[in-house]
Amino acid sequence: MKIACIGGGPGGLYFAISIKLQKPSTDVIVIERNKPADTFGWGVVLSDETLDNLEKNDSISAESIRSNFAYWDDIALHHKGKKLKSTGHGFCGIGRKTLLVILQERARELGVQLKFESEVGSASDYMNDYDIVVAADGLNSKTRSEYAEIFKPDTDLRKCQFVWLGTKQKFDDAFTFIFEKTKHGWVWAHAYQFDSDTATFIVECSQDTFDAFGFNNLTQTESINVCQDIFKNYLDDNKLMTNANHIRGSAWIKFPRVICEKWSHKNI
């Protein structure tokens, strides 16, 4: 059997690993348009339950992930000058780039062919040459858009705006939520450690607050400076950082919820 996987993110790579573990004779290729180390996010979060599932599926890659994550058991909430803490919530954070490298190495060990810096084109281009074409091309999937009449996606764009940043400030004792009331309304942050030096720092606010600050008209640098000022009491003079310089403008986006009525078409 020959399988082409369009998209070399964590989902595409882990699918390739899983199919090779189940059917080692399968010919699997993963095609990715970016370079191996390219990534435009910071850390990702995995729960204890997810880690257990990864362990059951592939103990080797699971162990590599475990040896590279930051773990916490608490959730801390900062609101109106008070700090509330809740314990018993097992989660870990791992750098997205580190996760990609681990999965790439494991996929190669199992015989998966990885093809980087290659524009995929249409999923239909692979239908005749491969038994199965897996569309792992992300949230803004071109495949889903191309076959929208068949997959019938239902996309609900959520109401709040957010920007995904990083910082050298330590948040290694808890998954941290910070709520700050500003002259334009509430702004909040989700912060968590994902390696020994760096934490994810997601800033979020309502559309009204976003508009009042004029974030849509600011450059990324200007936008980050505003966020640093809002959360300065929690950053200890550490900067907020972006790795989304490939995006024009402020890099704020909304969370979409995507559900498809149908998830396959022919051999895609």
What label would you give each PLM region?
Residues K35-N53:
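Conserved N-terminal glycine-rich FAD pyrophosphate-binding loop of Rossmann-like flavoproteins
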Residues E105, D129-F255, I259, S264:
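Conserved FAD-binding catalytic core of PHBH/FMO-like flavoproteins
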Residues G11, F15, P36, N140:
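Conserved Rossmann-like nucleotide-cofactor binding loop
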Residues S18-G41:
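Glycine-rich FAD pyrophosphate-binding loop
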Residues D48-W164:
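Conserved N-terminal helical subregion
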Residues M1-G11:
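Beta1/beta-strand and adjacent pyrophosphate-binding region of the FAD-binding site
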